[in-house]
Every structure is written in structure tokens, then in C-alpha cells.
UniProtKB/Swiss-Prot annotation:
The keyword tRNA processing does not apply. GO terms for cellular component: extracellular region; membrane; other organism cell membrane. It comes from Ectatomma brunneum (Ant). Heterodimer of subunits A and B; disulfide-linked. This is U1-ectatotoxin-Eb1a subunit B. The keyword Hydrolase does not apply. Its main location: secreted. Keywords: Disulfide bond, Membrane, Secreted, Target cell membrane, Target membrane, Toxin. Expressed by the venom gland. One of its GO terms (molecular function) is toxin activity. Belongs to the ectatomin family. Ectatomin-Eq subfamily.
Length: 37
């Protein structure tokens, strides 16, 4: 499917949701990035 279209349609809401809930996924992302590095 077209990811670009989805981002255009939901991008702003996704960004707002991400900012609001960043404390939920930030530790996971840090852990994931550290494992990759």
C-alpha cells in the first residue's frame, strides 16, 4: 500500500499522538537503536 498517502492523511495526528505518548515508546526505541549499534 501507499505509505506516503497514509502519512499525508494521518501524519499530523500521528505526530501529535507520538509527541503525547513518547514516554511509552522512547525507551524501546533507545534499546532497539543501541542493539543495532
Amino acid at each position: 500500500f501507499a505509505i506516503g498517502a497514509i502519512i499525508k492523511k494521518f501524519g499530523k495526528k500521528l505526530v501529535e499522538y507520538a509527541v503525547k505518548h513518547k514516554d511509552l515508546y522512547a525507551p524501546y526505541i533507545k534499546k532497539h537503536l543501541c542493539e543495532k549499534l
